[in-house]
Amino acid sequence: MINEIYENSNSRMKKSIDFFKKNISKIRTNRVSPSLIENIYINCYGTSVPLSKLSNILSEKSNILKINVFDNNIIKKIEQAILSSDLGVNPQIQENYIRIEFPKLTEARRFELIKLINKEAEQNIISIRNIRRDANEKIKKLIKAKTIGKDEDKKFQEVIQNLTNSRIEDTKKILKLKEKEIKKI
């Protein structure tokens, strides 16, 4: 029973960190990444489809993305979806592909991005702590039901605290790497 609680907590904390990584990977640094636009949805073929399923997205230069569209009939729809996104860029249609040139980051924008990723990191840390709290509450219920003793409770709390500290440290490492990436000129 205790092992199940531990494994569940560990799994949830890993998912939380993966979600955090995914969220901050979408935040632009000096080098643009296809992940910035791959989840823009385009209304075509009677449904809403992510751009990554309709095209091949390449990083042409540090600030230019090239979108090789599979079906030229939807190239205008893709352009409209990019224009209506909050990226603030102008896509340029050229033959069978779209080029997007992103402006260089200003110092003020870098500062805003660092604040944003710090906020994301703090939310992730709160999520990890909530998972720890849930695990501790489950253990307290087991104590009340007299399924486990107080000694096991203390050991488990120590183990879950070490896991929590480790996952928070992982979050902080990911944060520092992303900050370094944003600050890099």
Swiss-Prot record:
GO terms for biological process: cytoplasmic translational termination. GO terms for molecular function: ribosomal large subunit binding. InterPro entries: Ribosome_recyc_fac, Ribosome_recyc_fac_dom, RRF_sf. Belongs to the RRF family. HAMAP family: RRF. This is Ribosome-recycling factor. One of its GO terms (cellular component) is cytosol. Gene3D superfamilies: 3.30.1360.40, Ribosome-recycling factor. Responsible for the release of ribosomes from messenger RNA at the termination of protein biosynthesis. May increase the efficiency of translation by recycling ribosomes from one round of translation to another. It is found in: Cytoplasm. It comes from the Bacteria. It comes from Wigglesworthia glossinidia brevipalpis. Keywords: Cytoplasm, Protein biosynthesis.
